[in-house]
Amino acid sequence: MADNKGKTVDQRKICISDYIYDLPDERIAKHPIAQRDACKLLVAGRERGIIADTHFYALPEYLPQDTLLVYNNTRVINARLRFRKVTGALIEVFCLEPVSPADYEICFSGSGPVVWKCLVGNAKKWNEGTPLHGSIAIDGTEICLTAERLEQLPGGEFLIRLSWTGGHSFARVIDAAGEIPIPPYLNRPSETCDSTDYQTVFSRIDGSVAAPTAGLHFTPEVLSALDKKGIERAEVTLHVGAGTFRPVKSECIGEHEMHSETIIVERDLIRRIAELDLSRTLIAVGTTSVRTLESLYHCGCLICQNRWDGVIPQWYAYSDEHPHLSRHDALKCVLDYLDSNNLEHLTAHTRLMIAPTYRYMVVDGMVTNFHQPGSTLLLLVSAMIGDNQWRQVYDYALAHDYRFLSYGDACLFFKDR
């Protein structure tokens, strides 16, 4: 695929070392500031460079009045479960995604046993066939929670069956039994305050093991200001997986296996975007919303080619076989697919890798945080504003006391059409 200067670039040969920058530990925000929307906001565009150094509560001033703002409504679950063996050994079960039932809504609403793909800490001390037991209290009643190790998967994860007494939904059980999983780079244990600090005002659909952190800056006051300006809002669902923290260990990104995440988009929003005038601005809140919306486009292209199997492959966007449909035509294919299958929403698994030279087909800009050096999220940012601009933005932020990563400050980026 050609880059913005017309030169042919092989995305798979992009060196991750070109996306490394020095991030001192003291610049990593360990907690959010007291007033969420008082964090700093750096506004920049691919062509315009740095536009403003301001605060997040001023966000509405920098969005065109015709903006459609799309955010992720996923909610972080208390995914860390700890069990103590009779020998005293501590076993941690980190729930990643449901396997049986695989549907998130059915899994969380059900009261029967569930099977999850999990990471297991201290797994060598837990023999297969030996169940672990723990007790929790729900509404003053003691509940017994049991974990059974079924099998180890090729990637090192385990299939774990969880069952419990009391007839409560799994949503209530994991909420009572688990601990919220904060990012590993915070280098601290989770605290009581994280149960609220690490949820967005949009969160309502259980399923993530990490927060869509760009949404952490929004407050009722910011939402009210957006409403007063007439800015429309809509929601998508991407359940953020632990793979979002997976470092790129290979020198070339072509050797990196992109993690899969589940996306859910309602039919009505797909229709709205398909009918959206191209002159209007669509801003995604967070890289998860970006990935969801762009995956939606590629889903339509796969449907058009009769190749849809429920998964957007990692490198499909760059394939010579890609049909490069217009946004409207691709989303029309998705709508036709939903109609023919009598579905009200699209559920898919995306492995989409957004890297430099990627052509954004749905979003015009995004609200996001400052990301880890050498991460796939930084590649996504570079794809939007360019290599020179992301470095200029990050250098400026480091020189002007911006706070980085999940609990840090925010950016508003435009791809500048």
Tell me what each language-model feature is.
Residues A2-R417:
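Surface-exposed, charge/polar-rich loops and edge strands
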